[in-house]
Amino acid sequence: MCDRSLYRSGYVGSLLNLQSPDSFYFPNLRANGSQLAALPTISYPRSSIPWTCPSPCAAQPQGHAFGGAAQPYLPGSVPISISSNSNKECLEENSKYYAHDASSKQEERCRQRQSFANDPTITHAANLKPAKYDHSSLPRSLHGSAALFEVNSCTSSLKEDIKNSVNLNLTVQPAAVQSCLRPSVQDGLPWCPTQGRSRKKRKPYTKQQIAELENEFLLNEFINRQKRKELSNRLNLSDQQVKIWFQNRRMKKKRVVMREQALSMY
């Protein structure tokens, strides 16, 4: 039987030129975190590191896992160390650092706003007032009768201006409307003939007139011009009114006949 010691990883690795598992990690570290004395330590120059943590985190003792070497900064990550106490201190310092930075930025913004508000050269919209009512520059002794007199005079002048404008609107507006409604005689033709010509009001027929027209319609549906003139003179109607009444009466009779025919079919 063959010896099983020949199949060990150290012997097979030496034949196949394979490195030991410790070589895949940091060459100066072991699994238990101790440092090899024979191998040289890895050291990075401090200028090559883009970011270093604050003073308690940067000044770590040499007895830790990484020794004097510092870990490069990766964006979105937190510096990692084996000791839990130093990691907690680092996180606390980072939070303090960023909180202090944010508070300092807010203080700067508040100072800028205060300086902007206190700047006398800049006038705000809320502080804009008419010059007549601004008495802040006057001494207190002049805020008595002179200021009241000026305010009263301003209010009275404003009231007079409002009254005059209202009176002008009331007097000018109807005149303008009447001038638009009246026909323009100078031009020869009315500006709007429909407005210039007044429409006659409809006069309803009296019962006596309707009775006379109905009797004449029963005798003859179509009347001549002579008969129409006689009816108009007798009933005190115009020739056009008599003509229109007979036309409407014939249409009414036609509708009645068509309705009776439709009902008889059903």
Curated annotation (Swiss-Prot):
Expressed primarily in limb buds. InterPro entries: HD, HD_metazoa, Homeobox_CS, Homeodomain-like_sf. One of its GO terms (molecular function) is DNA-binding transcription factor activity, RNA polymerase II-specific. The keyword DNA-binding applies. The keyword Chaperone does not apply. Residues 198-257 bind DNA. GO terms for cellular component: nucleus; transcription regulator complex. It is found in: Nucleus. GO terms for biological process: embryonic digit morphogenesis; pattern specification process; skeletal system development. It comes from the Eukaryota. Pfam families: Homeodomain. Keywords: Developmental protein, DNA-binding, Homeobox, Nucleus, Transcription, Transcription regulation. CDD domains: homeodomain (cd00086). Interacts with MAF and MAFB. PANTHER family: HOMEOBOX PROTEIN HOX-D12, HOMEOBOX PROTEIN HOX-D12-RELATED. Belongs to the Abd-B homeobox family. Sequence-specific transcription factor which is part of a developmental regulatory system that provides cells with specific positional identities on the anterior-posterior axis. This is Homeobox protein Hox-D12. It comes from Gallus gallus (Chicken). The lineage of its organism: Eukaryota, Metazoa, Chordata, Craniata, Vertebrata.
